[in-house]
Every structure is written in structure tokens, then in C-alpha cells.
């Protein structure tokens, strides 16, 4: 399994992300040619070159706006020096115009630009997902409807390039899973249209809800709303554990000189593909006062609401009473309904809950032709080789009844086939 890991020890911004992914292996020409499909090429140029921060070499990306003769990162210098007079993504209002004349595009404008392009559907969808993260945050912060939001910085062409460029690069890398570390957001304060605001800015905080962060490593905004949205729209899990083999490292160089390297580090890794690991939960309870006939009914209901496995263990409880430990394996999605069944249908008044990692072999299902008809077979692979398989019991049972034959004959008919 191919892994992309973001090490955000100094945060993340749109340009640093683009630079890091180019440094990781996305060809410059491919990125530039794909971005031209947005039909915004007359508004900007991209400068991609090697750079260094505190001795670390990586790639630096500048999006140069043709109609302004300066780039986005000069604007960020103003913002980060607390002289900027607008929010990162401001609601359009009656305040004086931006000192740098950006196009203040709405979400609908951006959707039209992306949807009318010739980019592939996956890139379009991913780009829109990232923009939606920003739009939802801005709408929440400013108390507006989603499509009333007008962007300043993120609606400018340089930020559109950062976001759509991120989608292009992720699509090119063909990774199976994206992970990230805790996100460093920085500290201090920034002057915005509404006054002096703490770092991270309100929109950034909204985007980073439910995402683990670190603060205060420098008195500077290290994670921008664009960078936060790229993570929020793509990362499957935020973890400090690197449970994969690192194949390549790359660095996106930032534009500030800090006491720590102003870089975004990314890893391209390989996770052993013969197995998959899922985080699941065990819910269990000890019961010694329930009619044993009811267990079968309870088990049926548990499976119906999404339990992955149900098992019962004989136990000896206090005062020598025999009992049953009812254990249910479930995922987070079905946990609430599983608990409802346990509390409503058993005599339990308390449940133990703990998280487990389930390690699974890679599996697939296929049809096997037999003398009794087609039967579904589950195959399991280890290190790329088929190591075990078995027919689906319910199908074998139905065929045995329909054909009036022993179920053992149905199983044998499957195992006679050469499935390797």
C-alpha cells in the first residue's frame, strides 16, 4: 500500500504543500500543463526552483501574478508582519478595497472555473472538496450562508493554483492512503479587518476541528486556511506512528526565516500490502441472570445493526454463579446501535469498551463454477500469494437444500476446482 505522510512540524501552507509534492516527484511540466486546463494562464506564472532553510534543501514554489508584478508570498509577508488589513478569506462587504486588487471570487465562481476545465473528474472533485472546507469554515465564522461567502486570498488565482495544484499532485502520486502528524499552527497575533486576532485565525481553527494540533513553537502563523483545508479534505488519519517503510522524503521550502526550518516535510512510504489494519472496538458485558434462549435473538439483532462479530464465553462469576461474557466486535459507525441492542435486549446494566486493531489478510471474492452451479468463494492472500480460500456457507446451505444433496458434497465440489 502506497502512503503519503505529511510531517507538519512547522505547519503547512498551500505553496509549501505544492513545493513538497513537486520535490517528492511530481514533474514540473506535468503540474504546469495540468494547471493550464483551468484557463487562468494569462493571470499568473509559476516559478519552481530549489531552495534552502537552515541547511535543508528542498523545492520552493512561487505563483507570480502577472497583473500585480508581485506574488502571493509578498502578500503573506505583509499579513504575517501584522500589517494586513483583511482576513485571509474575507466575506465581501462594504469595507475599503484590498490594497492589492485580487479577484474576490465566490464559491460559485470557483466551482464554475473548475467544472468548466478539462481536468480529470478526480482532480475536480478533490479540488472542490478542499474549497468546500474553506467555504464552510468562512460561512460558520461570519454567520453567512455557504454561497454568500466571497473569498479574498483563497479566491485569488494564486490560491486557486495552490489548491487545484494540490489535487493534481495527489492524483499523480497515486497513493492509497494519506496520513499526517499533529499540525503545528504557530502562535502570536495577527491584525485583521475585525481587529487583532489570535493565531490560528478563526477560519483555520474551524477547518482544524477534530484534528490534533500543536501551538506556539514560533510566534507566527505556520498553518494557513489553505494548508489546513488540504489536510482536512485528504488525510485519513493523524498519527505520530510511522507504520510503513519510508521510500522517499521531500521538502517544501517556505518563505519565512524562523528559528526552526520553515519547511513542510513529506514522506512517500510503502505499507505491507498483504494485510490491512482497521481500528475497531470490543464491547463486552458479563451476564448471569438472563434466559439463555434469548441469546440467539440478541445475536441476530446485533448482526443486523452492523456488528462484525459476536461471541459468547462461559465464565464463573461472583458467588460461584455461572454466566456468559457477551463480546461484540464493531466499528465506530455501528457502535451506538450495538450498544442500544445490548441495553434494550439483555439484562446488562454496564458495558466495557476498548479499542482494538484488527489485522486482516487481503481478501477478494470470486465465483467458482461447480456441478451444482456458481458458488462464491472468499480468497485470502499473504505476501501476494493465495494462502487459503473457502466457499460461502449460506450459498452452500441453500444449494444443498435446493438440490437435496449433502452440504459436504457442495463443499467438495468447490475444493475440487483449481483456484490457484
Swiss-Prot record:
Q: What is its EC number?
A: 4.99.1.12
Q: Does the keyword Lyase apply?
A: yes
Q: Which GO terms describe its molecular function?
A: lyase activity; nickel cation binding
Q: Which BP terms does GO give this entry?
A: protein maturation
Q: Which Gene3D superfamilies does the UniProt record give? A: mk0293 like domain, Transcriptional regulatory protein pf0864 domain like
What ranges does the record give for the region Disordered, renumbered to this chain? Answer: 81-104
Q: Does the keyword Lyase apply?
A: yes
Question: Which UniProt keywords are given for this protein, alphabetically ordered?
Answer: Lyase, Nickel
Q: List the disulfide bonds.
A: none
**Annotated catalysed reactions:** Ni(II)-pyridinium-3,5-bisthiocarboxylate mononucleotide = pyridinium-3,5-bisthiocarboxylate mononucleotide + Ni(2+)
Locate the compositionally biased regions of type Basic and acidic residues.
90-99
What InterPro entries does the database record attribute to this sequence? Answer: Ni_insertion
Role noted for this protein: Involved in the biosynthesis of a nickel-pincer cofactor ((SCS)Ni(II) pincer complex). Binds Ni(2+), and functions in nickel delivery to pyridinium-3,5-bisthiocarboxylic acid mononucleotide (P2TMN), to form the mature cofactor. Is thus probably required for the activation of nickel-pincer cofactor-dependent enzymes.
> Which NCBIfam families does the entry mention?
nickel pincer cofactor biosynthesis protein LarC (TIGR00299)
The entry assigns this protein to a family as follows: Belongs to the LarC family.
This protein's name? Pyridinium-3,5-bisthiocarboxylic acid mononucleotide nickel insertion protein
Query: Coding gene?
Result: larC
Amino acid at each position: 500500500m502506497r502512503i503519503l505522510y505529511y510531517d507538519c512540524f512547522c505547519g503547512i501552507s498551500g505553496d509549501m504543500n505544492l513545493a513538497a509534492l513537486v520535490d517528492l516527484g511530481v514533474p514540473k511540466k506535468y503540474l504546469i500543463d495540468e494547471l493550464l486546463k483551468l484557463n487562468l494562464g494569462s493571470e499568473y506564472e509559476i516559478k519552481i526552483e530549489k531552495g534552502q532553510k537552515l541547511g535543508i534543501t528542498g523545492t520552493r514554489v512561487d505563483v507570480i501574478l502577472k497583473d500585480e508584478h508581485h506574488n502571493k508570498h509578498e502578500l503573506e509577508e505583509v499579513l504575517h508582519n501584522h500589517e494586513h488589513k483583511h482576513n485571509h478569506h474575507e466575506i465581501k462587504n462594504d469595507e475599503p478595497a484590498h490594497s492589492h486588487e485580487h479577484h474576490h471570487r465566490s464559491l460559485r465562481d470557483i466551482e464554475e472555473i473548475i467544472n468548466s476545465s478539462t481536468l480529470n473528474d478526480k482532480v475536480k472533485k478533490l479540488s472542490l472538496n478542499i474549497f468546500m472546507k474553506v467555504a464552510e469554515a468562512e460561512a460558520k465564522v461570519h454567520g453567512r450562508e455557504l454561497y454568500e461567502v466571497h473569498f479574498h486570498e483563497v479566491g485569488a488565482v494564486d490560491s486557486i493554483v495552490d489548491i487545484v495544484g494540490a489535487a493534481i499532485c495527489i492524483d499523480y502520486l497515486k497513493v492509497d492512503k494519506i496520513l499526517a502528524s499533529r499540525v503545528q499552527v504557530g502562535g502570536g497575533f495577527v491584525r485583521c479587518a475585525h481587529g487583532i486576532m489570535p493565531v490560528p485565525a478563526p477560519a483555520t481553527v474551524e477547518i482544524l476541528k477534530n484534528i490534533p494540533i500543536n501551538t506556539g513553537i514560533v510566534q507566527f502563523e505556520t498553518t494557513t486556511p489553505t494548508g489546513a483545508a488540504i489536510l482536512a479534505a485528504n488525510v485519513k488519519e493523524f498519527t505520530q506512528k510511522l507504520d510503513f517503510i519510508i521510500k522517499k522524503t521531500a521538502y517544501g521550502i517556505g518563505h519565512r526565516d524562523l528559528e526552526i526550518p520553515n519547511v513542510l516535510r513529506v514522506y512517500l512510504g510503502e505499507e505491507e500490502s498483504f494485510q490491512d489494519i482497521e481500528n475497531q472496538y470490543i464491547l463486552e458485558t458479563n451476564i448471569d441472570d438472563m434466559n439463555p434462549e434469548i441469546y440467539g435473538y440478541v445475536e441476530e439483532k446485533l448482526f443486523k445493526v452492523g456488528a462484525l462479530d459476536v461471541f459468547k464465553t462461559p465464565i464463573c462469576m461472583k458467588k460461584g454463579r455461572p454466566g456468559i461474557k457477551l463480546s461484540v466486535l464493531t466499528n465506530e459507525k455501528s457502535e451506538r446501535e450495538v450498544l442500544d441492542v445490548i441495553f434494550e435486549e439483555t439484562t446488562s446494566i454496564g458495558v466495557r469498551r476498548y479499542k482494538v486493531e484488527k489485522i486482516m489478510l487481503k481478501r477478494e471474492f470470486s465465483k467458482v463454477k461447480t456441478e451444482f452451479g456458481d458458488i462464491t468463494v472468499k480468497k485470502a492472500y499473504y505476501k501476494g500469494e493465495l494462502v487459503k480460500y473457502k466457499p460461502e456457507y449460506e450459498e452452500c446451505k441453500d444449494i444443498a437444500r435446493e438440490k437435496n444433496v449433502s452440504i459436504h458434497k457442495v463443499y467438495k465440489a468447490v475444493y475440487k476446482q483449481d483456484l490457484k
